[in-house]
Amino acid sequence: MHIRILGSAAGGGFPQWNCNCRNCRGVRDGSVAAQPRTQSSIALSDDGERWILCNASPDIRAQIAAFPALQPARRPRDTAIGAIVLLDSQIDHTTGLLSLREGCPHEVWCTQMVHQDLSEGFPLFPMLSHWNGGLRHRPIALDGEPFAIPACPRLRFTAIPLRSSAPPYSPHRGDPHPGDNIGLFVEDLDSAGALFYAPGLGEVDEALLEWMRRADCLLVDGTLWRDDEMLVCEVGDKLGRQMGHLAQSGPGGMLEVLAKVPAARKVLIHINNTNPILDTASAERAELDASGIEVAWDGMHIQL
């Protein structure tokens, strides 16, 4: 299984266009040892030729340009993207569908709750129906059974409902439903390698830990270092848990969770611009390094 990190930042990217926190200011003027990042999205493949896009970032055009495998140029109009999987209906995970309209129709796999949000609150499905057939919904069930996507037939996907939050525009924001957010457990039938992918993760219970323990690689929510980070940095008024993100530090935080899991690789993705782990010289980054936890970067390639 080929895993390409197209974008590794949280919503707004890094640096965020209107943010002057220490990290954003520092990456602009060179005073912080960090590299810019686009908004989170990954691509998966079983053969390195046909790819499945997991979430469609607002930065998708630049991400495709930075990864030539997604543009094989076999004909006047071409793409190696064979399907799209949406793990939620967040703006920073779905807006890229608008930039992909010239390639419609697209097979879009998502839960019923995500499809509802993208048909009513943020109506991408009806809007894009005017472009060559638009988005063809392929429902993702929450029954725990693995499913295949024809674009990459040697991969098996299992959707795992997560405890997180629907986007602010959703009619049921603050009223969680199964399917608002999912994680993916992806297995390669040939190599037997397994990935657990959850860029938006608010809580981890024992059932979810069992899925994580089965994976060779964890690619999980790295949004915030501390739960009150947005308040401390004076850039927001919400705690991480209110936004559906489990902070890395503190009791029950992501670092404690990952210490319980034997995966060969543990990688944080969807990293907010305020998070000190973006600074490679920070004490927080050193703590991750000592724990064997990696920080995803745009262009990172993992093979299982």
UniProtKB/Swiss-Prot annotation:
GO terms for biological process: pyrroloquinoline quinone biosynthetic process. Pfam families: Lactamase_B_2. Pathway: Cofactor biosynthesis; pyrroloquinoline quinone biosynthesis. Disulfide bonds: none annotated. The keyword Transport applies. The keyword Nucleotidyltransferase does not apply. Keywords: PQQ biosynthesis, Transport. Belongs to the PqqB family. May be involved in the transport of PQQ or its precursor to the periplasm. This is Coenzyme PQQ synthesis protein B. It comes from Pseudomonas aeruginosa (strain ATCC 15692 / DSM 22644 / CIP 104116 / JCM 14847 / LMG 12228 / 1C / PRS 101 / PAO1). The gene is pqqB.
